């Protein structure tokens, strides 16, 4: 199995531009599984609830997830990507898992960092594991790594690969 990641600096608020960057990079990627950054569609560091509401989308029916599904189908790969999710009036810092067969799942970040608590609700999905055929994968997002139980829970549930979309903003982050 070939696993890759594409770490880049998403431009805040420029969803179409960020998705164009992702598509161009993944069109050249030779991988079965690709992991993209936390909030890669919207960019990071929201300053207001209005920004979050304007940039968040429903999952799986929103335009970002749908475009990623199209890319995954065309490239025959699984993609894990971060985006701001809106479920009714509640917003989450989420990561979608999509593949050649379409939408696989969504993880909502459990451990919010600093000002994320002003704009996002703590995740309610729990730590999940998905069988993508070549491996069983789990997802945790950025600050979740700070809590060892996140990775431990995924391992105990059978994750062979832990995908970790991140937008590390602290100077001591690995």
Which residue ranges define each predicted feature?
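A conditional alpha-helix N-cap/helix-loop micro-motif detector
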Residues: 15-19, 61, 143
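Short beta-strands and strand-loop turn motifs
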Residues: 6, 80-81, 163-167
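Cys-nucleophile CN-hydrolase/nitrilase-fold catalytic domain and related Cys-dependent amidase chemistry
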Residues: 24-100, 169-174
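Residue-level recognition of beta-strand->loop/alpha-helix junctions
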Residues: 7-9, 37, 45, 108
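Short glycine-/small-residue-rich Rossmann-like dinucleotide-binding loops
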Residues: 7-9, 39, 141, 167
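N-terminal phosphate-binding loop and adjacent alpha-helix
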Residues: 7-25
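Extreme N-terminal starter segment of soluble prokaryotic enzymes
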Residues: 1-5
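Active-site catalytic loop in hydrolytic enzyme cores
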Residues: 57-60, 86-174
């Amino acid at each position: 199995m070939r696993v890759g990641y594409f770490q880049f600096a998403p431009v805040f608020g420029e969803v179409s531009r960020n998705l164009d960057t992702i598509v161009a990079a993944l069109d050249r990627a030779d991988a079965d599984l690709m992991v993209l950054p936390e909030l890669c569609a919207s960019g990071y560091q929201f300053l207001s609830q209005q920004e979050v509401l304007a940039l968040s989308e429903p999952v799986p029916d929103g335009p970002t997830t749908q475009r990623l599904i199209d890319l995954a189908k065309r490239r025959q790969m699984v993609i894990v990507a971060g985006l701001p999710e809106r479920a009714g009036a509640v917003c989450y810092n989420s990561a979608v898992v999509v593949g050649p067969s379409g939408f696989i799942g969504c993880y909502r970040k459990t451990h919010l960092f600093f000002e994320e608590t002003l704009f996002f609700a703590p995740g309610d999905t729990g730590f999940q594991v998905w069988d993508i055929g070549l491996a069983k994968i789990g997802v945790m997002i950025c600050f979740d790594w700070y809590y060892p139980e996140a990775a431990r829970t995924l391992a105990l549930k059978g994750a062979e690969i832990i995908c970790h979309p991140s937008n590390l903003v602290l100077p001591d982050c690995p």
